[in-house]
Amino acid sequence: MSILSENNPTQTSITDPNESSHLHNPELNSGTRVASGPGPGPEVESTPLAPPTEVMNTTSANTSSLSLGSPMHEKIKQFDQDEVDTGETNDRTIESGSSDIDDSQQSHNNNNNNNNNESNPESSEADDEKTQGMPPRMPGTFNVKGLHQGDDSDNEKQYTELTKSINKRTSKDSYSPGTLESPGTLNALETNNVSPAVIEEEQHTSSLEDLSLSLQHQNENARLSAPRSAPPQVSTSKTSSFHDMSSVISSSTSVHKIPSNPTSTRGSHLSSYKSTLDPGKPAQAAAPPPPEIDIDNLLTKSELDSETDTLSSATNSPNLLRNDTLQGIPTRDDENIDDSPRQLSQNTSATSRNTSGTSTSTVVKNSRSGTSKLTSTSTAHNQTAAITPIIPSHNKFHQQVINTNSTNSSSSLEPLGVGINSNSSPKNGKKRKSGSKVRGVFSSMFGKNKSTSSSSSSNSGSNSHSQEVNIKISTPFNAKHLAHVGIDDNGSYTGLPIEWERLLSASGITKKEQQQHPQAVMDIVAFYQDTSENPDDAAFKKFHFDNNKSSSSGWSNENTPPATPGGSNSGSGGGGGGAPSSPHRTPPSSIIEKNNVEQKVITPSQSMPTKTESKQSENQHPHEDNATQYTPRTPTSHVQEGQFIPSRPAPKPPSTPLSSMSVSHKTPSSQSLPRSDSQSDIRSSTPKSHQDISPSKIKIRSISSKSLKSMRSRKSGDKFTHIAPAPPPPSLPSIPKSKSHSASLSSQLRPATNGSTTAPIPASAAFGGENNALPRQRINEFKAHRAPPPPPSASPAPPVPPAPPANLLSEQTSEIPQQRTAPSQALADVTAPTNIYEIQQTKYQEAQQKLREKKARELEEIQRLREKNERQNRQQETGQNNADTASGGSNIAPPVPVPNKKPPSGSGGGRDAKQAALIAQKKREEKKRKNLQIIAKLKTICNPGDPNELYVDLVKIGQGASGGVFLAHDVRDKSNIVAIKQMNLEQQPKKELIINEILVMKGSSHPNIVNFIDSYLLKGDLWVIMEYMEGGSLTDIVTHSVMTEGQIGVVCRETLKGLKFLHSKGVIHRDIKSDNILLNMDGNIKITDFGFCAQINEINSKRITMVGTPYWMAPEIVSRKEYGPKVDVWSLGIMIIEMLEGEPPYLNETPLRALYLIATNGTPKLKDPESLSYDIRKFLAWCLQVDFNKRADADELLHDNFITECDDVSSLSPLVKIARLKKMSESD
């Protein structure tokens, strides 16, 4: 006989229908059937039952000698009345259940059942009817109902014989279940010709009755619906059939079963045996009182301790292993095993028997019961050959069964080699314990230890990511759009930066004016940004990224006012809740880097998460234990440096290094971070803590990036951690340069993480290398206030005092001067001294300055190498070198990029950082190439000679924006005085303007344009030799004299002549004003300063760029509209007002308000128009038409009466002399 479980292979059990009336367990699976065997004969169906509420070990019970003639015989008569009905139902199930026989077990079942049928041909319906209602077997007893025809003496004889055969086979456990039969078993079966007892250990009958009853109700439909016509010996599933059970019984009778009736034939009793799980009597609840059975079982088990050891080892017989289908089917013996007080000592034996006799593939998976007292080691069920295995229904058992299942399930399906599953007791016992360990793993994975597992998983996935995890979104390179200003329905501005608001208010533009002309305000603000000398720097200064700030002052400027509205410290856990919030100039991204450092170690007063917890918190939400360390999530919640000065000695470092900075990285843009005095002390005192910190910091890259803003700001500078920017770093390439900084930082940290246990980095190295990298995120972008962090292995870290407070303060200084003490330390921090901090800060700044210089030298070397390569490229392009030389130059031309120049910093920067670094370098190279092109162009324009040989007696007479102005004598003509404009090209922000000026002057030979004589390029300095106008500029005359309308008309006429010439050449001067109108002593007027002039051709007949001086600027330029040559006419009109009133309109206004007034007021109003003639007012009105289409051009104005009736140029000579004398007197 074998057991088949359709739904759950492990939920097979046999019990009496009377016993099943108590328990109704709806959670048990249905479909268990008992078949009499593959051979012909009546079939019996059984219903699976859940285990009783109390289960005891059957390790000793199965082999107990008391099983012969034990209370099983007394219970037989109680169930005879149910034989007929249950037999009919079992017949139906046998037909359907026999189809699930495993192929690997089919032949073995056939052989065993054939032996049973040949020895017991008289199996009859009566036998089935007598055996159907047998009670559950108690521990220490065996189900001898299958052999009920004999008496007790026969049972004892057979028991003795089987015991002998078991002892013989004890040493032959190596027989595998699917190959050979142990000789002892074969001998016992053939010699005794007895059927293996369908032995079932009695246990608490009340529990079995309830379980069987519930299973009968639940599973009757499934059994009736099961296919009846299936062949009895066909099965490919893992479920065990009753034929499998029968084969197990026939092959392992001497192992697990103690046959009670040696005279009965084997086949007849197997076929006539009636399962105790009789589904035919679902309503019967009559059952023997369980208490007596429990007592007997317990007594029996206590008496049979000594016998059990021997017999349990004997039960590891390979005969059971031949039919692995029972290996996982828990019998009622098993359940008694589980509740037995001796389970620990007997578990190994029981497990051995289970693995050898039954397949764990049939172990119950959905059993449920809260009353069982399974231990972790009673995983495998002791599957005796009894055909009454019941369903274990305990949660613990359920988990353990699953584990054992996974361990031993292969034996039930595959005919493994000899000795694979015939394990000895200790070995199987170990398997069982390993199953419980697996259960512990599951519980740790899904239970209360989930944090540990998740943290470990986060560690394993930390380096994948960015990653993350390591997913990073790069910032736009060289993006200049720092603010988007809109206008709402009320006419108010939205998104207007506070700096612009301040600028507008400081410029005198009221809110009312802004609402009246919102678009004009936006235009003039945009113009004001664009017209600054360095637009990028001006834009950054708007956000208080001042390039002129001291680099040694750290990231904090304690006295600087907030640049942006201060955010609240609205962080989870109130990390900085108690400290005041003050906005800081540094960007959120830079503070993010500071957060990475600040949160490295938790305050001892705070709950310190373990390394695992901290790693976990990086991938999960911050731990509530670390609530006080959480970072405020407001991006603008900055804290000034003074608030972070530690005010007490650092507490002793904790015994274990902690890396709990992860909390701050859930809010990467937060900038006010609680930090304890002991954080840096911990890292400085324990080198290993440095490595503990590194993994968390690496995580932050990956994970700490929740918002795109924080990720972008983080990325804004990471790769050039160890390469300082050039002393005057241009802002455009510096943005991508700084972008790669954080990646370089994380890559720098990864080596520390990987080698944390084997090669700890000294605290000083961590101090100088890793910790300093974080605050310096956007250094290259804004000349930020920290030196580039050195590599961890060779950083000239500042000396750290041996005392813990000094170490702490030094570490804090190295990390971030701006640190907010945790609220828990606020009181103590108030009273602590700060002199140590100041000393350490000084030392730190000195060390960082040295480091910056070192890195700057390195960068200079790289740049020199690139210049050399580029020179080689130019030589190749010009054909100066042959093909070989050209190829060599091209090979050298792409030098090792700066990001790759520092591979020691680690490869953890990620693709984004590397790509950013490459793009940044490409932009720098492009700019460098552009500069070289400009220089090359200048070389073609300029004279290659030495100007010192031609011009002598240089006297500096002025300093312009682009260089100094000198007077010199021409060697060829000593009476000829020339003006030399000397400019350092390296300091010129817009070199193309210089070229433009030279080209315009060189190609514009006109009496009213300053003559261009020559130009020289000498050692990087550009010398422009021009005609000298000794009278000075018109500004001197305007400021020192009062001009008549005739004199004004002369200036306008001469200027218009020059403008007409320029406009005819397609050149727009775009900067006509009194400063650019020069006079000589004779009163001749010439236009100069063509730096802002623009070329206009047929294609580009209009210009839209913002150039010029605001007060003389035309409205179309202020409004950023297209414009043409008539902008010079507007400027001429403003210059007329300047000559009339001594100053241009709105000169007393701020430039921004002047632009606003120009854009909104239109034509400026004269102070005293009545004192002017009609001609000049008409001429002025024509020049100052807001609509440039109505504005006159230079040629039209030259024909105006005001110009035609003006004075001669000689009238200006007295004014020039007066202005010169006054100027000289002022200089004296």
UniProtKB/Swiss-Prot annotation:
GO terms for biological process: cellular response to starvation; chlamydospore formation; filamentous growth; filamentous growth of a population of unicellular organisms; filamentous growth of a population of unicellular organisms in response to starvation; fungal-type cell wall organization; intracellular signal transduction; MAPK cascade. ATP binds at I957, G958, Q959, G960, A961, S962, G963, G964, V965, K981. Residues 568-579 have a biased composition (Gly residues). GO terms for cellular component: cytoplasm; nucleus. InterPro entries: CRIB_dom (IPR000095), CRIB_dom_sf (IPR036936), Kinase-like_dom_sf (IPR011009), PAK3-like (IPR051931), PAK_BD (IPR033923), Prot_kinase_dom (IPR000719), Protein_kinase_ATP_BS (IPR017441), Ser/Thr_kinase_AS (IPR008271). Residues 57-70, 95-123, 246-255, 347-367, 437-466, 668-681, 693-708, 734-747 have a biased composition (Low complexity). It comes from the Eukaryota. Belongs to the protein kinase superfamily. STE Ser/Thr protein kinase family. STE20 subfamily. MAP4K component of the MAPK pathway required for the mating pheromone response, and the regulation of cell polarity and cell cycle. Phosphorylates histone H2B to form H2BS10ph. Required for hyphal formation and virulence. This is Serine/threonine-protein kinase CST20.
